[in-house]
Curated annotation (Swiss-Prot):
SUPFAM superfamilies named among the record's database cross-references: YcfC-like
Keywords of the record: Cell inner membrane, Cell membrane, Cytoplasm, Membrane
Highest taxon in the source lineage: Bacteria
InterPro entries named in the record: HflD, HflD-like_sf
Topological category with respect to the lipid bilayer: Peripheral membrane protein
Pfam families for the chain: DUF489 (PF04356)
Main location: cytoplasm
Identification of the protein by name: High frequency lysogenization protein HflD homolog
């Protein structure tokens, strides 16, 4: 798999998290499969490829690819504004996290603990999701710049929804970190927009 394809998969995963956060905030509901895919990416160890981090199937990131395509196409009518805002905010927070080795160590330690929990409860159990959410709350949400999630307050005030949103933001920032480690940069979204779109269309068709 080419470097650009691997970068695109990781960036698509950032947008997948963003799209799931948006849907959850607006409707109060998301499917278990995409939630499980993104939570599983937080615990992926020594994957054979970038795609293996996300279950080995591009279909798992389809909504993310669509949201990313809407951002790159620059068509006001089809732009998914909130997912784009969340995705860009996650990329920004990842840059801040990169300067905090202590926080990265803490997140790693806490994820090790969650992995043990998963063996007992399963990946999408509410206790596991609450643990992912508390990692986000204790670390990334302490930064001055926070991600403001917009949606229906009836859904946002439900504690289980709030926990899922925080867990998804943690997963999105993990994917942002992977994207940058693979050589991704925001400049590519500006100067290589057409190339990215062409490759994205291939992923969506595949």
């Amino acid at each position: 798999m080419s470097d650009s394809r691997q970068q695109l998969i990781a960036l698509g995963a950032v947008f997948e998290s963003a799209a799931l956060v948006d849907k959850l905030a607006r409707t109060g509901q998301i499917s278990e499969a995409p939630l499980g895919c993104m939570l599983g990416s937080l615990l992926a160890r020594n994957p054979a490829s970038t795609l293996d981090v996300y279950g080995g199937d591009t279909l798992n990131l389809r909504d993310g690819f669509k949201a990313l395509a809407s951002a790159l196409e620059r068509k006001p009518g089809s732009l998914q504004r909130e997912p784009l805002r969340y995705a860009l905010a996650m990329l920004t927070l990842e840059r801040q996290l990169d300067k905090r080795g202590d926080m990265l160590d803490l997140i790693g330690q806490r994820l090790d603990q969650v992995e043990q929990q998963v063996q007992h409860f399963g990946l999408v159990h509410e206790n596991v999701i609450a643990s992912f959410a508390s990692i986000y709350q204790d670390t990334l949400s302490t930064f001055r710049q926070r991600i403001q999630v917009h949606g229906d307050m009836r859904h946002l005030q439900v504690s289980s929804n709030a926990a899922r949103i925080r867990a998804l933001l943690l997963a999105g920032i993990r994917s942002a970190r992977l994207w940058r480690q693979l050589g991704g940069s925001r400049w590519q979204m500006v100067f290589s927009r057409r190339r990215l779109l062409n490759e994205l269309y291939l992923l969506l068709r595949g």
